[in-house]
Amino acid sequence: MKKLLILDSNSILNRAFYGVRYLSAKDGTPTNAIYGFLNILLKLIKEQEPDYICAAFDVKAPTFRHKQYEGYKAQRKPMPEGLAAQMPLAKDVLRAMGVTILEKEGYEADDIIGTVARLCEESEISCFIATGDKDDLQLASDKTKVILTVTKSGYNETIIYDDKAVKEKYHVTPTEFIDVKALMGDPSDNIPGVKGVGEKTAMSLIEKHHSIEYIYENIDDIGLKGTMLQKMKDGREMAFMSKELATINRNTPIEFNAEKCVFDGFENNGELYEILKRLELNSIIKKLDLSGVDNVKENEDIFKDFSYQVGDKNMISGDKVTVVLDFDGDNISSAAVGAGNNAVGLNEQDDIKELLEDDSIAKVMFDVKEAIVKLNCRIDIKNIADDTAIAAYLVDPAKNEYTIEKLASEYFGTVIEKPEVKQLSLLDDVETDRSEYLAKCAVALGVLNERIGDKIKENGQEKLYQEVELPLVTVLAHLEINGFLVDDHQLKEFADKLGEKIDALTNEIYMLAGEEFNINSPKQLGVILFEKLELKPVKKTKTGYATNADVLEKLRDKHPIVNFIMEYRQLAKLKSTYCDGLRAVVNPNTHRIHSVFTQTVTVTGRLSSTEPNLQNIPTRTELGREIRKMFVAKEGYVLVDADYSQIELRVLAHIANDETMINAFRNNEDIHAVTASQVLGIPLEDVTKEQRSSAKAVNFGIVYGIGEFSLAQDLHISVKEAKAYIESYLEKYHGVRNYMESIKEQAKKDGYVKTMLNRIRYIPELKSPNYNIRQFGERVALNTPIQGTAADIIKLAMVRVDNRLINEGLKSKLILQVHDELIVEAHKDEVDKVKQILSEEMQSAMELNVPLKVDMSTGHSWYDAK
């Protein structure tokens, strides 16, 4: 049976846009979504070998669903400018590939896909749907397979579902998936569902009763009781409407002929080569082996004399080796050790442990932190000479991912094939393939480490690498292993307290509205505010009234209901994101949150915190700050919080060599009051609280390249006044003005900027023909040396503090870094010593011509320690 591959293009491009770090051509054209999309497409072509390919796109126009329900997708934010710019380019690339584009006004891509799948089934063609959206699982059958694209550990992976696989995974059939969505709704599409029915309940009901029609015909006889029974009865109308909205239309009026979608491959495709070359997607050009690849490096055969065998660690000699580990969960299943062109596979656990703990052998590894965290002290990896993933990040921090395979392809044009996980037959030697793959990675790692090491030296980044980023790997592993203790009981109480407040606010809103309605529905809220209460609409959308935060802020003084709605939204988000969300990630064994800290994500050098993101714990409201009360020290310990004071302004004073700013910091004066005094021409002692606040906004705004429009908004003044304030500021701070002018010129000339430790950030946006993108590039040029240097300083401090805590044999441990602060869980007998270490190491982390100041506090909870 012939095979057709159809792409849910918007879905895959959207996932790629958010999953791939910002990439752009030299002219500033964003390319990250296209890059990710093409990598997924090429993987699918290789895996599925389709006879036909077509791509479905949404059309920017209302669909029949918008006519059925005005609130459909009303909450969805507009497509980001960077993604919107790539949509037509993606179509150009697909057309050049010979891929047929399918789109129809009034219908969504899913409807086109459903229709094509039906036509394929009728024509005895096997249909494969590639998507990032589970909505398409309703189309799965014995002839139609749904390929869900997912990203795991930096790799694009695919999961294939037919009807049996859907049933096995979710315990409902593909068509029953529609009924599940009818009950639980879908916030991303603003499909309402039944209020109060979540995914778990919806799945359970449909698994038992198979359809909402059956459920509602027998609503009193299927075991529902109490509030759930009432919720279901109240939500009947919404359930049936939601089912209509969630059902893919498989009779979309499109012209489709599979024979017009024949896929012939990419050979000698000059048009495709030219488009990819213009977008500077050179790695895609390499993968496709397109003719005329004059701007791509010649392939180097790094495996020319390659040899490997499975044995023991003594078969590799030398005092420096490469080590690649293969994990099964948190345990090492095998390893490969390389030296030159030779590699040895290790399968014995004792051999691997002995090698890793041998301090006399220097080890070149890749993403060591992950290994340290997984091993969690069972094996102590000693003498880590290099982490090539970190080095590659320093050389080019804008990549979306760092893997040995990708780097080998980029640097040498070498393809390292990753063996399939599945075993096709008993005769397949999967273990041998895996061993050879690991061995090749070990050999490639050695060559990569040498080549990337040369670039580190060329860039003058030795100190940044050897003294900051490489030792930080171990420190971050310690942070992840240590974790932060959470008072789960107190967190539950706080969640309950918020729930009570939300219920009270709900009742107040209903009373003021004169009726009950879905507060979370912008459409219903709009009707209440602008029709029933007759408030003047601030903005209208195609589907109704705008009710976003900006609109509500403007209506705050027009009716008391608005304040209650704003507070309701704030508390609802606080509860769902930070109370319920945090409780879900508390380790049940340690009762701690073990956030993941990553070095290779941000282009500024700042660390990334995920699972959960502890850098986003709210601080602007008292209720938000209360979340920090749930993060506590264990018994017999206290939290010591050390926070750099105005570190970015101090870095600015140093880099700009601004005398006024330098003198203020050296004299320990209030920099914001000094700025107000200088700009307004008044004595320092006469500066008011409001004047200081305005000066503070300017001081920090200047660091981020703030303009008069943004400043005017922040200070609630006219644009003319804001412009005058900025001009007066730059007249007084000559060094800052000169820095701003010189760094922009230098960045335009070189195409990049550097921190004090030579951390590099390339800024292709400066060459964009788009004025707004160029302006963004200038702001990046201004801020990166300051923010990046501040990031380098806090990292240096982390390394020094962690080393001293360990080397001095203290029980106290570094457990968190958030922006400019470090938190140590200190034993009660070591508090003074910990404070001394934090003060000494943080204040001496980097020598500036102004002092680095650290504010310190202690407490049982994170809240108390702030």
What are these regions (language model features)?
Residues 456-468, 472, 793, 797-818, ...:
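Active-site palm subdomain of RNA-directed nucleic acid polymerases
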Residues 24-25, 74-253:
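Extended two-metal-dependent nuclease catalytic cores across DNA- and RNA-processing enzymes
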Residues 153-181, 300-303, 330-458, 468-472, ...:
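Active-site-proximal helix-loop-helix substrate-binding element of RNase H-like nuclease domains
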Residues 336-343, 367, 395-418, 422-426, ...:
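Function-dense linear segments that define catalytic or interfacial modules
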Residues 4-5, 9, 15-54, 70-71, ...:
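Conserved RNase H-like, two-metal-ion catalytic cores of nucleic-acid enzymes
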Residues 235-347, 426-619, 638, 648, ...:
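Conserved "right-hand" nucleotidyltransferase catalytic core of DNA-directed polymerases
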Residues 481, 587, 594, 599-602, ...:
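Conserved catalytic core of nucleic-acid polymerases
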Residues 500-507, 511-563, 731-779, 783, ...:
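C-terminal polymerase-core module
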